[in-house]
Structure formats: structure tokens, C-alpha cells
A protein has these predicted regions:
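Helix-start (N-cap) segments at beta->loop->alpha junctions
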Residues: 173-181
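Structural recognition of the beta-strand scaffold that forms the well-ordered cores
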Residues: 105, 170-172
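Extracytoplasmic/periplasmic sensory segments of membrane signal-transduction proteins
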Residues: 26-121
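Proline-rich, low-complexity intrinsically disordered regions
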Residues: 3, 18-19
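Boundary of Sec targeting at the N-terminus
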Residues: 21-24
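Bacterial N-terminal signal peptides that target proteins for export
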Residues: 1-8
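Bacterial N-terminal signal peptides
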Residues: 8-18
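Extracytoplasmic/periplasmic ligand-binding sensor regions of membrane-associated signaling proteins
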Residues: 116-168
Length: 181
């Protein structure tokens, strides 16, 4: 590998680590913490709990057959995609949207989508901290980054959806960094 490419790669890796290591200003972190509290209340709402419970009990065949490759080919106008923001849980998320919230999506225990504000980049988030941490009963806060699906500089927070005293799914919400300031 040429030295210039190696240096460029090293710089990119350093920049990524710097972004992830950067702590938020305490005033901004306080706003993120307040959003986390609000989102935990959403995750306990009967509409979201019911949607996750139903998803976990019986995954529809069209959802079971969905793959990441196929998901990427679907447009936001596809009836399959629209079903996730038009269902009752999707409408609940829409009712909670503010200028600070850039995205929100609800996943079942399997990491597959139950509802969202807008089509997500990935069909499943299983195996990623934003889903796995809430599934262990913890909240999660990601780094500030440019989100693939929204194109905005945001950070994501995630909370468990509790059903029967146990984590049954996850609720991930993207917060617009510029609107938190």
C-alpha cells in the first residue's frame, strides 16, 4: 500500500476515534438526558408495548421473508414500507415528533422493524448496540455522527420496551445536534 494511502487511512481512523471520544458539552448532555427520560416514557406507552408484543408473537410472512438486500431496494412509497409509519405505533411516533427528533424507530426482540417515522437504512439492528443494549434492559447513547438515513448530524439514543417485566424490543430516537443547542 502506498505511503500516502496509508497516511490517509490513518487520518480517517484517527478522525473517527476523535469524534466518538468527544464528550458533549454538559448543557447539551443535560438536554439529551431529558430526551432520554421522555423517550423512556414513550417506550412504556400501551400503543408501543402492544405493537412490540404482537410483532414478537407472530411475525407476518412478508416481514419474515424480508432481507437487508431487498429492504435497500424498496422506496419510501412502497406499501410494505409505508405500513410501518402508517400503523398505530408509527402514528404514535409521528405524534411525538419535534424539531429535535430527526428519526425514531421501534424494533421487536428480533431487531426487525415494528414502526418508524421514516424508512431506516437497515431492516434489522440486531447485533448493534442501539438494539442489543436496550434488549439487556439498559439505555444507550451513540456518538454524534451524520446519519445515513436522514443526512443530518445527530446522535441516537435507545431505550428498552418493557413487556411483562422484561425487555421485549427497543425504541431508537435520533436527536438533531443543531436543534439541541
Amino acid at each position: 500500500m502506498p505511503k500516502s494511502r496509508l497516511l490517509a487511512l490513518a487520518f480517517c481512523l484517527w478522525a473517527q476515534l476523535s469524534i466518538h471520544a468527544e464528550a458533549l458539552d454538559p448543557a447539551i448532555q443535560a438536554k439529551v438526558d431529558a430526551q432520554m427520560t421522555a423517550i423512556q416514557a414513550w417506550a412504556n406507552d400501551p400503543v408501543l408495548v402492544k405493537a412490540v408484543k404482537e410483532h414478537n408473537a407472530a411475525l407476518p410472512p412478508d416481514q419474515a421473508a424480508m432481507t437487508q438486500e431487498k429492504w435497500k431496494t424498496l422506496t419510501v412509497l412502497d406499501p410494505f414500507v409505508r405500513g410501518f409509519n402508517k400503523n398505530e405505533a408509527g402514528q404514535f411516533l409521528k405524534s411525538k415528533k419535534t424539531e429535535v427528533i430527526s428519526e425514531a424507530f421501534l424494533s421487536g426482540a428480533d431487531g426487525l422493524k415494528v414502526a418508524f417515522l421514516a424508512k431506516t437504512t437497515n431492516w434489522s439492528h440486531k447485533g448493534k448496540p442501539k438494539h442489543d443494549e436496550p434488549m439487556s434492559g439498559k439505555t444507550w447513547q451513540g456518538p454524534v455522527e451524520v446519519d445515513e438515513s436522514t443526512g443530518l448530524q445527530q446522535l441516537q439514543i435507545a431505550v428498552p420496551v418493557i413487556e411483562g417485566g422484561k425487555p421485549a424490543g427497543s425504541l431508537v430516537v435520533g436527536l438533531s445536534v443543531s436543534k439541541l443547542k
